[in-house]
Swiss-Prot record:
Subcellular location: Nucleus; Chromosome
Keyword Nucleus: yes
GO biological-process terms attached to the record: chromosome condensation; sperm DNA condensation
UniProt KW keywords: Chromosome, Developmental protein, Differentiation, DNA condensation, DNA-binding, Nucleosome core, Nucleus, Spermatogenesis
Function: Protamines substitute for histones in the chromatin of sperm during the haploid phase of spermatogenesis. They compact sperm DNA into a highly condensed, stable and inactive complex.
Stretches the record annotates as Disordered: 1-61
Family under the similarity heading: Belongs to the protamine P1 family.
CC annotations in GO: nucleosome; nucleus
Protein name: Sperm protamine P1
Species whose genome carries this gene: Macropus giganteus
Tissue: Testis.
Length: 61
């Protein structure tokens, strides 16, 4: 029984880790895509503001 419980916890931790990594990658990809589009459209005017906002969001994630 002890062995079964150990394997179960191990699989659960592995699943959780994989899920977290995938979600983080997806969020990062979307953020980079949005930033690139905004920079090309607006230019250098709003660069500092966008950077500050993104840093705050990154900290939360």
């Amino acid at each position: 029984m002890a062995r079964y419980r150990h394997s179960r916890s191990r699989s659960r931790s592995r699943y959780r880790r994989r899920r977290r990594r995938r979600s983080r990658y997806r969020s990062r990809r979307r953020r980079y895509r949005g930033r690139r589009r905004r920079r090309s459209r607006r230019g250098r005017r709003r660069r500092g503001y966008s950077r500050r906002r993104y840093s705050r969001r990154r900290r939360r994630y």
